Structure formats: structure tokens, C-alpha cells
Swiss-Prot record:
It holds the Pfam family PK_Tyr_Ser-Thr. It comes from the Eukaryota. One of its GO terms (biological process) is stress-activated MAPK cascade. The lineage of its organism: Eukaryota, Metazoa, Chordata, Craniata, Vertebrata. Belongs to the protein kinase superfamily. TKL Ser/Thr protein kinase family. Residues 431-523 form the CARD domain. Residues 335-368, 519-539 are annotated as: Disordered. It is a peripheral membrane protein. It comes from Mus musculus. Residues 65-73 are annotated as: Helix alphaC. Keywords: Adaptive immunity, Apoptosis, ATP-binding, Cell membrane, Cytoplasm, Endoplasmic reticulum, Immunity, Innate immunity, Isopeptide bond, Kinase, Membrane, Nucleotide-binding, Phosphoprotein, Serine/threonine-protein kinase, Transferase, Ubl conjugation. Transmembrane segments: none annotated. Disruption phenotype: Mice show a lack of chemokine production induced by bacterial peptidoglycans. RIPK2 deficiency affects cellular signaling and cytokine responses triggered by NOD1 and NOD2 ligands, but not TLR ligands. This is Receptor-interacting serine/threonine-protein kinase 2. Serine/threonine/tyrosine-protein kinase that plays an essential role in modulation of innate and adaptive immune responses. Acts as a key effector of NOD1 and NOD2 signaling pathways: upon activation by bacterial peptidoglycans, NOD1 and NOD2 oligomerize and recruit RIPK2 via CARD-CARD domains, leading to the formation of RIPK2 filaments.
Amino acid sequence: MNGDAICSALPPIPYHKLADLHYLSRGASGTVSSARHADWRVRVAVKHLHIHTPLLDSERNDILREAEILHKARFSYILPILGICNEPEFLGIVTEYMPNGSLNELLHRKTEYPDIAWPLRFRILHEIALGVNYLHNMNPPLLHHDLKTQNILLDNEFHVKIADFGLSKWRMMSLSQSRSYKSAPEGGTIIYMPPENYEPGQKSRASVKHDIYSYAVIMWEVLSRKQPFEEVTNPLQIMYSVSQGHRPDTSEENLPFDIPHRGLMISLIQSGWAQNPDERPSFLKCLIELEPVLRTFEDITFLEAVIQLKKAKIQSSSSTIHLCDKKMDLSLNIPANHPPQEESCGSSLLSRNTGSPGPSRSLSAPQDKGFLSGAPQDCSSLKAHHCPGNHSWDGIVSVPPGAAFCDRRASSCSLAVISPFLVEKGSERPPIGIAQQWIQSKREAIVSQMTEACLNQSLDALLSRDLIMKEDYELISTKPTRTSKVRQLLDTSDIQGEEFAKVVVQKLKDNKQLGLQPYPEVPVLSKAPPSNFPQNKSL
């Protein structure tokens, strides 16, 4: 099958039809954004590959073949692919948008979803098994090999849609992927990977039993609402422990006695993650065991469970207070002779985790020099996030009950009147650092010479150090051309300060962009996140 034939079999979706792109997540097989299709008038999801260098025709065709496989795999519990965006500088799969995110978010956002009823948990497990069983029964069988809670999406009624199957070429070509510390060296995630796959030479023999091992770990995770091996930070420790036969604990501490059909479920889990692949059951056998369990629940209980989650989600959203056009008093840890002044700001300073407003607490001023300058700032750079991998400002600021909700569309706000302690005389801007000065002096040369690979490495480094906000990353990564991405990166550097600029300079040096010499002398950057951000221990 040639490239033209593949393109004709997949509905083409021009890039300019994808309006309002918004960053959602980043994974091994690319970056996922939401968008609004200009003609269809519906929201869609776009998984696009990070293209650092021009793809060879053979590479592009290999990737398109995988997209074609996804397009053919049409089933109730498989994420539907709507088309392909195949352009020189943008290659992406367009799918249905899943409003309730992933199973990982449902299980581990316990503030947002304090309780998940047992009937719904069992329905989710049953639908995952149905979806993977369908893939295994295709001709030829389609093996997922990256099954994890992050790839199990949930539609508006919390039904399962399995994503990211058959994307080995996408994962291979996405060279800029920012690997989790528990990511496997060849795609997939260590905690969901069977021990025989630690040794590549044995993969072909055991490949059919890979997905059932991952499913067993997911069953444990759904029933316990805990992260497998959450206390272990080194993937080598996990690999050694699993290769010695150790698995997540199934005692009452993790799987309490009130779990319906607990004995049967533990039996399924333990057989699914058996050390010997030949001892693991097929998905068909799992379904035969699960179907009688599902029949013990009345249909109404599933509906009640979904309504309960929707109510919890609404309540959590309503507790996120947006400070907008409302005069407020903030305690800013300032001397008594500098009383706090009033702030009017069109941004959200609270994450969902803060819950209902409580007593006023102190606010530590961010280290961003643009913030301290008193200059008007883009509100998007101040928003708090509640999603895996992002650090919010939980507990830093609380809002009086009188605070008003605001329109998220507000584009800018003035922080010049927050406090004379933060903004001396409201006009003096802190001196620009060496790295920032160098970037400003070399701006057009950087735009001309910075490669796509260097750009993506810079974004990865900024993400790993928590130096870039979600909205800023989104603005950069969704630009249609390399030059527009670089310009946006440099604009963001001007706002975010010296530490941000140092990362960009270091990556330019690492990539030997010799036309930009001489480089400024900046300290060698450590790989650890900055100390003023809390460490994220979740997987």
C-alpha cells in the first residue's frame, strides 16, 4: 500500500480547519490538544507528532499505515479516529473528544471525585476487557502493548474508549518525548509492563500475553484507587522487584474486604500478572468471569453512579474561584507599615484542590521578574492547573466568600497595585539578566537558526523544571510553523525571566548552533526542578 492510497483511505482534515487548539497532555506518541472543527462545529482531539526534522516518505507512510489501522478498528469501546491532518510541518490524528478525560484522572483526582461507586468501577473494567478482546480478535490480531490508565479515556457518560493502540511508529518517531521516570525504554510504562518484556529478545514469544498483564495492574489500580509501586521512584527497582515475582499488595490495606466479589477479582488479578506468560488467561476468559459479576448490579445503579460523578465534578468546578473585577484584601507577609492594597485580576489563583474558601492565608510572591515589575501580565501565565504533571498554587492563597467568578476569556490584568512591598513605586523594573539580554540581542538570528529539535528539547527542559505554564506551552507548540514557534518561545522568555532564558541558551549551545556564537556565560543547569516548586510524586 503506497502513501497516496493511505491518504485517500483516511479522511483528510486540513490544519486550518482545526480552530482554538488547546494543549491537553503530552505523551510518548505525541502531544494531545483539543480543537474545534471549523466545518463540523464540534470539539475534537488532535494527537500530533513532534516533527524535528523533515520525515522521509517511508517514515511518513509507516506512520500513516498505523493511523489507517486505527481507522479500521471501529468498536464501541475503541476511540474513533475521524481523520488525519497530513501536512509538511504538522502530522496529527484527529479523534473524538472525550470530555471526562482519562481513567487515570478519574481514579487519582480524589478531591474532584471523592467516591466512585462499585458498579461503575466494574463496568469500566468490563468495557476495557471488551475493547482489548476486540483488538485481539481482529485479523491479524492488534496488540496494544501500551495499555495503561492514561490511555483509557472516558466519554460523557463515563463509558470506556481505548486509545493509543498500534502506535509503535508514532512513539518511535516522537523523539522529543519527555519520558516519565517510570517510562519504559521502548515505549509503554514500566509499572504496566510484564517482566518478560524487560528482555527484548523474548518479546515475540510472549507478546500475546502482554496486554493481560497490563490489564491485571489496571484492575488492581481501579479497585484500590492507588498508584502501583507509588513508593518506588527508580524504575530499575520496579523492574528488579517484578522480575523476582513481586507485585502490588493485595491485602486488606489496598483491597478492602468490602469490595464486591473480592475473592474472584483477586484471583483474576493474580492470574493476569502471573510470572509465566503461558499461565495468564485470555481476555475472553476474563470476560466469561466478569459477565456474571456485572449482572449482579441493577441497571439503575450504573446511572446513579454516573450522576454522582457528574455532580461531584460540577461541585469541584464551582469551588474554583476566579478573581475578576472584585476588590479583595490579601495578606502578603508584608510589614505592618505597608498595608495590603486591592487587586483586580482576570485570572484564577486557585486550583480545584482548594475546595471551599477558608481563612485568609499568606501569599508568597512568585519569583518571576515580570510579575514583580508591575507591568501588565497575560493572565494565562498566572492560572493554576489541576492536572497530572502540573503544579498548582494549592494552599498558597485563599479567597473571601465574597469573591466573584469571572470570565476565563479575560486576556490581561494589571498587578501594578498589589502592594508597594512587591512593586516599589510601581514603575521600577528589575534589571534584565545576562541570558535574557543575549536572547533579545540575537532574536532574529535565533529565529532563523534554531532547529525544530532544539526547540522541542527546550520545551522538554522547561517542562521538567516547571518553568513554563500550560497555556504558554500550548501557545508555542500549536503554532503552525517552526519560525512562529520560535518567535512565541522568545516572547515567552521575555516575560518569564532569566531562569527561563538560561534554559533556552543552554539548549542552543548543546545543539551547537554555531552561528549564534559567542554565547553568554551562564551557570550549568541542574536537572532537578526548581526548589520553589513542590515535587510531584505521582506517576
